[in-house]
Structures are given as structure tokens and as C-alpha cells.
Design a protein with these regions (language model features):
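Intrinsic disorder/low-complexity segments
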Residues: 1, 148-179
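Long amphipathic N-terminal alpha/beta scaffold segment
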Residues: 55-105, 112
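Glycine-rich phosphate-binding segment of PLP-dependent enzymes
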Residues: 91-92, 104-128
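Conserved PLP-enzyme active-site core in the AAT-like
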Residues: 130-150, 177-374, 488
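Conserved PLP-dependent catalytic core of the aminotransferase class-I/II
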Residues: 206, 364-365, 369-424
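Long amphipathic alpha-helical segments
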Residues: 1-78
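Short Gly/Ser/Thr- and Asp/Glu-enriched loop/turn motifs at secondary-structure junctions
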Residues: 13-14, 89-93, 331-334, 433, ...
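Conserved C-terminal alpha-helix-loop-beta "cap" of PLP-dependent enzymes
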Residues: 397-480, 484-485
Length: 493
């Protein structure tokens, strides 16, 4: 297309002011106001200019587009005035998908958030005393129940979809100290608060192999610098011994830090001290030991064949003084950073001015309280994250077969194939849960095109594209969403 021809096409586009005052747009103007309508008009006209510039529109196609201008502007208005944050169907098989919001909340948690948010609440009010209270009492009481030593705990099996409670090993002595927990807005904030409270102005000893970077360019050394503590690296990337920690301790040392390698593993010629060795060293040198678990489970994940994820209780029982972890990962609750440990250390953190800057609101407390109550009452199946982890390959296969039978068509080929689900969220990167995938191909479109069509449904369906196929893993799909997937596939076919 010649430049002068493009210029002619540009001249055929109406002005913003012309459309704003056109009789056809009077209803939209009255309904949405001049600001919203002007923005929508500019957005639609801008797209038309881009299409002309790139040669995608000729005179005939431009006239068709101008004929549908009112509809296009109306649609743009509806998009602009609707929610950007919206539900999606997660068919990726990644349970704690960070980009898709991590852990879905339990129904009780959603109900409690609404109940606590629609009116006033006793967030920081002691009803019995009639005076100001503390907001973290609502969840600290539950964490004390869950993280206190428990003997002869009842054990459930994974097959029953109810994770077993963590229990003290037979004959193991129970520690007699209490555990206190405080809440901030995410695990990075928890690490920041812990370092600032316990080590500001001093040194923190950490293994070089644990200086991790996770999503969003979050690096442990950067957080440490912000905390006011000085990083003292010991060992090498693949091998660090307890002697390396001991040699590094000076009068400036304030804290020993263990960081869980959340999203990668080091294998082969490796060595690192055990938690027991670090605890013994910390006690001998009268230093606090803090462990950043990252994800942080409240149940034993080995029943799901998930290895390499220590529980919060495991760390506390081993003698770690402060454990930091996330609320919206393996715990299955809202986004939050949790610090559990020695009450005297927690008291110091509560008195830190940084704590107020990092504290969470009533909605987070409500969602977390309801989630923790499910743990206390052993209603583990009510927590979607734990329920998804407990699903068997056979259960997933039956659901996938039902969708396949309902949506099968000559234009679309579907079959079931073996695959693996991931925990995600940086948890247990090498653990893969056996699953059955619904593999889909379509004669008239590529896998990428089919995937795009699925994402444009309401709610959007997000799967994986591998080897020219769209793969849907129902492990991360809520059962009530199965019919929505079947309907979408039928409409595409």
C-alpha cells in the first residue's frame, strides 16, 4: 500500500470530537459520561490507525470497520469498565501457579472474609476487656495449637484425601517451649523483618549455595542489604560444612541463617550441614538460628510422594529459633508472610517499627483464621491446595474421560496421556505428581491458536502447549469447572 493511499485512509477516520457529539453516541455518552467515552473512542481509533499503518486495512475493510464503529466502542467501554482481575480455570497442572494467584481459598475462608469485611469487626478490640487489643491474637492462638508438640497424633492416609497431622517420633522428647507467630504481608517481608530485628548493624552467616533468587528478581542478598545486616557468605556453591559457619563467627555475628532452595536443586558432589548441626552450633555460640522455608507446610507431604520440603513443625522441633514461610503456598491460605518461633524473639519483632509498615489487614486475618481452623479441626479436604495434592491419577482420569466423551467431535481429536503435575510456587521443584492429561489437537487450527481460543472464554481456560498439542491437567481444575471446559471445547468444535 502506497504512503499517499494510507494518508487517504487516515483522512476517512472520524475525529474524537465528531464521534463524541454524534447522535448515535448520545446514549453511550449519557450512560458512561464524556471521560470514559472519550477514552474508548481514542482506543478504538488508535487500533484502526495501527492497522492502516501496518497495511492490514484497505478501503473496503476500513469501511466495514467504520460501519461497526459504535459496536467496537461499546465493547471497549464494557472492557474498560469491567474488572481486570478475573477468575481463570487453571488447567496447567501447577497447583501453586504464581501467575494465576497461587492457592485458591477454601469456601470457609471466603465466607469468613465476607463476614469480617462487610461490617465492623473486633480486629484490634478486646471484647471482654472493652479496650484495644492486638490483631494477631486471632491467628496466633491457632498457630500455637498447630505448632505445639503433639504425641500420639491421629494418622490419616493420602488415599482418604486427608493429610496426616505431624507427630512427634516415638520416644522423642517434646520441647517445653511455646511457639508464637506473627503475620506480615509476604514471605519476603517476613525475612526482612526477621533480619532487621535480629541482625541490624551486624553480620548474618549464610551458605553461598543458599543465596537464592526467586521470581520477580527477589534475591536474598538484596533483602539482607535492605534489612541493615551485613551478609557473610561461607562455603562454596555446592559444598558448605558446619566448620565453615564456626570459623566465620566473630563478635559482629548476630544471626545464623538457613535458606531453603525453593525453586532449584544442587545435585552431585554436594554437602551441607544438617539442621541439627546448625542448631547445636547456634546454641553453643549463643546465637539465634533463623530458617527461611519459603513455602512452609503444616502437614507431612511425604504421603503425597513429595520430598525435600520440611514442615514448619519439623524445623521448630529441631530447635530452629525463627521460621519464615508463606501463607498462600503449601499452607493453602491467603498471601501472607509468617514468622513462627521463640516468643521472646517474636516480641522483639512486634515492637519493631517495621512490623507496622508490613502488617496485614482484616481480610487477610479472616482468610488465614478460617484456613487454620480447618487444620485444627482436621478438615483438610476443605483446603483446595491439599485436596489437589491428594487426587489420584485414577480420579483425574475419570474426570478427563467424561470431558472427552462429552466434547468429542470429528474436527477435534482428544486422548488421554500420562503426565506430571507440579507443586509450583518454588516448592519441591523435583517432585512430580503422576496425572492423566487431556491432550487435544484440532484439524483447522494450531495448538497455539486453540490455546488462545480457550483463553478467550469466560472464564478463560489456561492449559499447556507441548509438542503441537493443548494439554489440560484436571488436577488443578475445580470439579465444578469441568462442565465449563466441556462446553468450551464443544463450542470450538
Amino acid at each position: 500500500m502506497k504512503t499517499e493511499t494510507k494518508s487517504e485512509l487516515f483522512r476517512e477516520l472520524p475525529s474524537v470530537d465528531e464521534l463524541l457529539h454524534a447522535p448515535d453516541f448520545a446514549e453511550l455518552l449519557a450512560l458512561h459520561g464524556p471521560t470514559a467515552l472519550t477514552d474508548a473512542i481514542r482506543s478504538v481509533l488508535s487500533r484502526l490507525r495501527e492497522q492502516i499503518s501496518s497495511g492490514l486495512l484497505n478501503r473496503e475493510s476500513l469501511q466495514l470497520a467504520l460501519g461497526g464503529l459504535k459496536s467496537a466502542i461499546d465493547a471497549q467501554l464494557r472492557r474498560a469498565l469491567s474488572y481486570s482481575l478475573q477468575p481463570v480455570i487453571n488447567a496447567t497442572g501447577v497447583i501453586l501457579h504464581t501467575n494465576l494467584g497461587r492457592a485458591p481459598l477454601a469456601e470457609d475462608a471466603l465466607a469468613h472474609v465476607r463476614e469480617a469485611s462487610r461490617t465492623y469487626s473486633n480486629l484490634e478490640f478486646d471484647i471482654a476487656a472493652g479496650e484495644r487489643g492486638k490483631r494477631d491474637v486471632h491467628v496466633d492462638r491457632l498457630f500455637r495449637k498447630l505448632l505445639s508438640p503433639v504425641s500420639n497424633a491421629h494418622v490419616e492416609t493420602a488415599a482418604s484425601a486427608v493429610p496426616r497431622a505431624l507427630s512427634v517420633a516415638e520416644g522423642q522428647a517434646e520441647p517445653d517451649h511455646a511457639v508464637s507467630t506473627i503475620i506480615v504481608n509476604n514471605n519476603a517481608a517476613a525475612v526482612l523483618l526477621g533480619l532487621n530485628t535480629l541482625a541490624e548493624g551486624g553480620e548474618v552467616i549464610v551458605s553461598r549455595g543458599e543465596l537464592v533468587e526467586i521470581g520477580g528478581s527477589f534475591r536474598i542478598p538484596d533483602v539482607m542489604a535492605k534489612s541493615g545486616a551485613t551478609l557473610h557468605e561461607v562455603g562454596t556453591t555446592n559444598r558448605t560444612r558446619i566448620a565453615d559457619y564456626e570459623k566465620a563467627i566473630t563478635d559482629q555475628t548476630r544471626l545464623l541463617l538457613r535458606v531453603h532452595r525453593s525453586n532449584f536443586e544442587i545435585t552431585g558432589f554436594t554437602e551441607q550441614p544438617s539442621i541439627a548441626e546448625l542448631v547445636a552450633l547456634a546454641q553453643r555460640r549463643r546465637l539465634p538460628l533463623m530458617e527461611d522455608l519459603g513455602s512452609g507446610a503444616l502437614v507431612d507431604l511425604q504421603q503425597f510422594e513429595i520430598r525435600g520440603e520440611s514442615s514448619v513443625l519439623d524445623s521448630l522441633r529441631a530447635g530452629v529459633n525463627v521460621v519464615t514461610y508463606s501463607g498462600d503456598k503449601l499452607l493453602g491460605g491467603p498471601q501472607a508472610g509468617l514468622l513462627s518461633g521463640r516468643p521472646d524473639l517474636m516480641a522483639r519483632m512486634r515492637s519493631n517499627a517495621l512490623f507496622r509498615a508490613l502488617r496485614v489487614d482484616k481480610m487477610t486475618y479472616a482468610a488465614l483464621e478460617a484456613t487454620l481452623l480447618s487444620y485444627v479441626k482436621r478438615e483438610y479436604a476443605a483446603i483446595p491446595t491439599l485436596r489437589m495434592m491428594s487426587l489420584t491419577k485414577e480420579e483425574i482420569s475419570r474426570r478427563a474421560e467424561t470431558i472427552k466423551n462429552r466434547a468429542q467431535s470429528p474436527r477435534m481429536k482428544m486422548n488421554l496421556t500420562d503426565g506430571g503435575s507440579l507443586l509450583g510456587g518454588g516448592a519441591a521443584p523435583s517432585s512430580v505428581l503422576p496425572t492423566r492429561l487431556l491432550a487435544i489437537t484440532c484439524d483447522e487450527m494450531s495448538a497455539d491458536e486453540l490455546s488462545a481460543k480457550l483463553r478467550h472464554f469466560d472464564p478463560p481456560i489456561v492449559g499447556r502447549v507441548e509438542e503441537g498439542r493443548v494439554l489440560l491437567d484436571l488436577r488443578t481444575v475445580l470439579p465444578e469447572q469441568d462442565s465449563l471446559i466441556a462446553d468450551a471445547l464443544q463450542r470450538i468444535a
